[in-house]
C-alpha cells in the first residue's frame, strides 16, 4: 500500500525515489487522495533536497500520463511534430512568427501556450487580442487546425497534465516555485502531453528573465535538455537575452501588429529577427527538416520572403475563428489605445541599462496584464518604439511611447519607464544569443 507520508519522508531524508513511488504519488495528486498539505510538503522537500535526473524524468512522465496524451500518428502527417517553449519575458512575440515559419517549412506545430505571469506577457493573451480567435478549441478542432494549417496556438486544457496544474497551484502559494527540478517537470510534462517529437527551449537571461541569474538560467536549460532527452523527446535549449524588451514594443495588440509586420516584411527588428531565426532554425534541424543551421536559415528566409509564412499565420487565425483579412488590415481588427504619449528622456546619453522587469510591470499597470487571475485585460495598451541598450538618446527625445486608456495611466507609465532607463556616456548592447545547450 502506498503511503504518501512515507514517500515524502524519503525525500526529506535525502533518499532516492523510485519510478513506481513517483507514479503512485502523482496518481494520488490527480485523484485527490494526496492532500494539498502533502503536495506542499513534497514540493518543499524537493526544493531543499532536489531530484536526480532520473527522478526528474520519472516525475515528468508521471505528470504527462496524469491526463490525455495527444497522438498524431493517426493523422499520418508528412512531417515532424515539433515546438518551441520560452521561459517568458517582455516583448517576446517569437511564437507568433516561429509557428507559421516552421509550418511553412514542413513542420507541424501544436503549440500549447500560457497566459501572462507576473511581469511577463503571455502568448495566449496576445492571441486573445485578435477578435474571434478561439484559444480554447476542443481537441478535434485543434488537431484539424494542426493537420490542415501546420500550426495552431492554443491554451492548456484541463485534460493535459492535470497533475501539473494542481502541483503548480500549490507551489505558487508555498514559496516553492523556484525549484529547477519542478519547473523542468512542469514545462516538459505539458510538452510531452502534446505528443511532440522534438522541442527547442528558449531560456531567457537578464533583468526581465524568470530566473534571476545567468547561472540559474543555464542550470534550468541543462535540466530541461537532460530530462527532455531522457523522456524520449529530442530537446535542445538556447539561452537568449532579456535585459531589454525583445521586440521594440510590449502589449498584446501591439505585439500582434509587430508579428504581422515581421511576417509580411514591413519591419524585422534586428534582435527579434536574430532570436526568431535562431530558434526556428534549431527547430528545423531538430525535426530533420534541414541538414544544418545554414540550410535551415535559407529555408526560413524563403518562407518569409515568399509570403508562405504570413499565409500560414493567416490560415491559422481563420481556422481558429479570427478574421480572414487580419494580415491585410490589422488596424481594422486590433484595438487601439485612446491615449498615446511619448516618454521624454530626462537627459542626453547612451542607454546603458534597462530594468526590463519594470517595463513588463508597467504594461501590467496599464491594464495589459493581470494582478489577479480574474482581471480583464485591455488589449490596446502597451509600449512602442522602445530605445535599445547602446542607443544614444538626446534630452526630451522619446525613450518610447506609452499607449494607455487615459491620461492618468499614461503619466504613471511615463514615470516608470523614465526610471527604468539608465543613461551614461557609453553603453554596449549585450549579446542577443548567449549559448546553445544540447
UniProtKB/Swiss-Prot annotation:
Reaction equations catalysed: thymidine + phosphate = 2-deoxy-alpha-D-ribose 1-phosphate + thymine
User: What is the official name of this protein in its record?
Assistant: Thymidine phosphorylase
**The keyword Acetylation is assigned to this record:** no
Class of this enzyme: transferase
List keywords of the entry alphabetically. Glycosyltransferase, Transferase
Q: What is the scientific name of the source organism?
A: Burkholderia lata (strain ATCC 17760 / DSM 23089 / LMG 22485 / NCIMB 9086 / R18194 / 383)
Q: Name one GO biological process term.
A: pyrimidine nucleobase metabolic process
Q: What gene name is listed for this protein?
A: deoA
GO CC list? cytosol
Family indicated by similarity? Belongs to the thymidine/pyrimidine-nucleoside phosphorylase family.
What domain of life? Bacteria
Q: Which GO terms describe its molecular function?
A: 1,4-alpha-oligoglucan phosphorylase activity; thymidine phosphorylase activity
Pathway per its UniProt entry is:
Pyrimidine metabolism; dTMP biosynthesis via salvage pathway; dTMP from thymine: step 1/2
Spell out the subunit comment: Homodimer.
Physiological role: The enzymes which catalyze the reversible phosphorolysis of pyrimidine nucleosides are involved in the degradation of these compounds and in their utilization as carbon and energy sources, or in the rescue of pyrimidine bases for nucleotide synthesis.
